[in-house]
Amino acid sequence: MKTKKKKKIVFVCTGNTCRSPMAEIVFRRLVEEMGLTTLKICSAGLQVAPKSKINEKSAQTLIDKGFDVVRFKPKQIDEKLLVESLAIVCMTDVQRDLLMEMRWQAMKAAGEEEIENNVYSFSELAGYEILDPYGKGIDCYHYVFELIAGGMSAIIEKLLPVGVREKYIPKKRTSSPTKKTTKKKENQEA
């Protein structure tokens, strides 16, 4: 089977309700600002509950940061996404390891001639994992948003073709104003 040109980047977390929706929505805006209309950005989860919705705190965080979440609906990762994606970015190394095996099986089943690694963890691309804020306060969701947004320039640099990425690589990563607050809280608790 001949390999189709892949134009989809997928962000993956556990339930597609907290982290990966934030990554999808932030990265989509960057791609639109770059004028890359043929590149499709989406997200999916490893274990998506039926009729699930974006987490209220994730939605509120995105709204607080100026993003629209009205049309977002969580979806389960499937063989089609595994086979048709240019890149799959998982929030953790454990998720990456699981998806690499799933993708390899899906590619073999689809009769793909070449099976290149296109499954990455956020830490491979940006230097740190994105841990799950589920069950924590809104400040934690804002912190996770800052981590995700801060890693986007590294993801652009490592995933997009050379001629494309030079058109738009943010001059500096978004800093997290909550990092100092978090360190202060940790020091106070110690």
Predicted features along the sequence, with ranges:
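Conserved active-site segments centered on acidic
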Residues: 2-84, 157-168
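Phosphate-binding/catalytic loops
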Residues: 87, 94-175, 179, 183-190
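Helix N-cap/beta->alpha junction signal
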Residues: 81, 92-94
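Hydrophobic beta-strand core positions in alpha/beta domains
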Residues: 11, 89-90
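Short, exposed beta-strand "edge-strand" segments with a Pro/Gly-rich flavor and a Y/T-containing core
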Residues: 49-54, 72-77, 89, 116-118, ...
